[in-house]
From Swiss-Prot:
Superkingdom in the source lineage: Bacteria
InterPro entries: OPRT (IPR023031), Or_phspho_trans_dom (IPR004467), PRibTrfase_dom (IPR000836), PRTase-like (IPR029057)
Record-given protein name: Orotate phosphoribosyltransferase
Binding-site list for orotate: 127
Enzyme Commission no: 2.4.2.10
Originating species: Phocaeicola vulgatus (strain ATCC 8482 / DSM 1447 / JCM 5826 / CCUG 4940 / NBRC 14291 / NCTC 11154) (Bacteroides vulgatus)
Amino acid sequence: MKTLEKLFAEKLLKIKAIKLQPANPFTWASGWKSPFYCDNRKTLSYPSLRNFVKLEISRIVLEKFGQVDAIAGVATGAIPQGALVAEELNLPFVYVRSTPKDHGLENLIEGELRPGMKVVVIEDLISTGGSSLKAVEAIRRDGCEVIGMVAAFTYGFPVAIEAFKEAKVNLVTLTNYEAVLDSALKTGYINEEDVPVLDNWRKDPAHWEAGK
């Protein structure tokens, strides 16, 4: 039986949500050059896969975190899936902006949380973990307890692993970088010669250069 990590990795590859271009890297908003790009928001356009993600995240929330009082999605990528999970579990939903609105109530958190609530945060992708953990901080400032985070995918960067450890946030993901690379190699999505390039990038993405 396939693990969830491998199964979801295959599904992402099937809908071409994963782009692997070692010779022609992407440029992230951070300025990092990357041979790997994950656009798992594409799952929203496939009803059966969208439902799969909703049910798997909901199962993880129930199995891993016990009593949960609310679901929070990190804007903007995790808002749709977070809302679907909250609906499935019949729980209140909020979402957390990256910056407060510049008009109206200037909210950072949209929706209603009450002090003492136990919250699970939903995220679509973990890279450095910075924006995800800012959302956690905002929820904690509201007097709530973040009991965990569930994300669709993580790159597994050392900086993110350390950041989540320091923030004392239990992170669970549906799949990860290693599972996607393994599936991509087995299905011919990438070649053997691509693997060292991709491995070197993951070890030090901030300083990686194509062809080196």
